[in-house]
């Protein structure tokens, strides 16, 4: 099995990149692909860039040119579930766009035309993620709906919009739905596993930039454990 791993930013892939053996690097269309073995598994690690378009371009190349069998999306996310704290982990059961609106044509809020309302994560990969979490006894995890938009959600108004239209949302970020939609169109199994860098409605002594390295550590540890189980 060849495992594809996607992170948007350098900070989100650096820990994993440093652990890849036989590393080779290719850059194309603004995306950087790191190929080699990780904990004995064949992997292609993609630094896609931030946002849905960058993520879709990178995921397309990852599947079509690098021929990965499964896709794991790692990195940071903003928590919406009240039980989440900084450094906790979210695992996708489904992923939706929160910034798409073609409801005028009878679609659900967040549903793109001619696409399903939600992109369903692979059940086997979800199970693998939960098994990987058992090696991280200090981390709390929530599984559920992750919502994506080309918006850094930082205002009460946007938070309320998302809660109103997607009441079961557990976390938000800026790439997962594009990755999920691309995987859906290629019929490639995926799961999103991210660490919480900030939580809606909770005060934190640390800023997003300050906590990002810690979130990257948590999400990278999860991915390393998953890769070991999948190889």
Curated annotation (Swiss-Prot):
SUPFAM superfamilies: Purine and uridine phosphorylases. Keywords: Amino-acid biosynthesis, Hydrolase, Methionine biosynthesis. The keyword Transferase does not apply. One of its GO terms (molecular function) is adenosylhomocysteine nucleosidase activity. It catalyses: S-adenosyl-L-homocysteine + H2O = S-(5-deoxy-D-ribos-5-yl)-L-homocysteine + adenine; S-methyl-5'-thioadenosine + H2O = 5-(methylsulfanyl)-D-ribose + adenine; 5'-deoxyadenosine + H2O = 5-deoxy-D-ribose + adenine. The active site is at residues 12, 198. It comes from the Bacteria. Pfam families: PNP_UDP_1 (PF01048). Gene3D superfamilies: Nucleoside phosphorylase domain. Its EC number is 3.2.2.9. Pathway: Amino-acid biosynthesis; L-methionine biosynthesis via salvage pathway; S-methyl-5-thio-alpha-D-ribose 1-phosphate from S-methyl-5'-thioadenosine (hydrolase route): step 1/2. Signal peptide: none annotated. CDD domains: MTAN. InterPro entries: MTA_SAH_Nsdase, Nucleoside_phosphorylase_d, Nucleoside_phosphorylase_sf. One of its GO terms (biological process) is L-methionine salvage from methylthioadenosine. It is an enzyme of class 3 (hydrolase). One of its GO terms (cellular component) is cytosol. The keyword Hydrolase applies. Substrate binds at residues 78, 153, 174-175. Catalyzes the irreversible cleavage of the glycosidic bond in both 5'-methylthioadenosine (MTA) and S-adenosylhomocysteine (SAH/AdoHcy) to adenine and the corresponding thioribose, 5'-methylthioribose and S-ribosylhomocysteine, respectively. Also cleaves 5'-deoxyadenosine, a toxic by-product of radical S-adenosylmethionine (SAM) enzymes, into 5-deoxyribose and adenine. Belongs to the PNP/UDP phosphorylase family. MtnN subfamily. This is 5'-methylthioadenosine/S-adenosylhomocysteine nucleosidase. It comes from Aliivibrio fischeri (strain ATCC 700601 / ES114) (Vibrio fischeri). The lineage of its organism: Bacteria, Pseudomonadati, Pseudomonadota, Gammaproteobacteria, Vibrionales. The gene is mtnN.
């Amino acid at each position: 099995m060849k495992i594809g791993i996607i992170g948007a930013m350098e900070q989100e892939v650096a820990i994993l990149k440093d652990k890849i053996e036989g590393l080779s690097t290719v850059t194309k269309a603004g995306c950087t692909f790191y190929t080699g073995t990780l904990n004995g598994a064949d992997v292609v690690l993609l630094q896609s860039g931030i946002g849905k378009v960058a993520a879709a371009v990178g995921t397309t190349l990852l599947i079509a040119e690098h021929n990965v069998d499964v896709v794991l999306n790692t990195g940071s996310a903003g928590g919406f579930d009240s039980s989440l704290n900084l450094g906790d982990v979210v695992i996708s059961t489904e992923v939706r766009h929160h910034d798409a609106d073609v409801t005028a044509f009878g679609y659900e809020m967040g549903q793109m035309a001619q696409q399903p309302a939600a992109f369903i994560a692979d059940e086997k990969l979800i199970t693998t993620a939960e098994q990987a979490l058992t090696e991280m006894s200090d981390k709390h995890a929530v599984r559920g709906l992750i919502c994506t938009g080309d918006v850094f959600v930082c205002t009460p108004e946007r938070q309320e919009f998302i809660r109103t239209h997607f009441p079961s949302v557990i976390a938000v970020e800026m790439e997962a739905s594009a990755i999920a939609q691309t995987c859906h169109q290629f019929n490639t199994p995926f799961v999103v596993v991210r660490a919480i860098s900030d939580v809606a409605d909770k005060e934190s002594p640390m800023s997003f930039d300050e906590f990002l390295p810690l979130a990257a550590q948590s999400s990278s540890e999860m991915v390393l454990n998953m890769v070991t189980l999948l190889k």
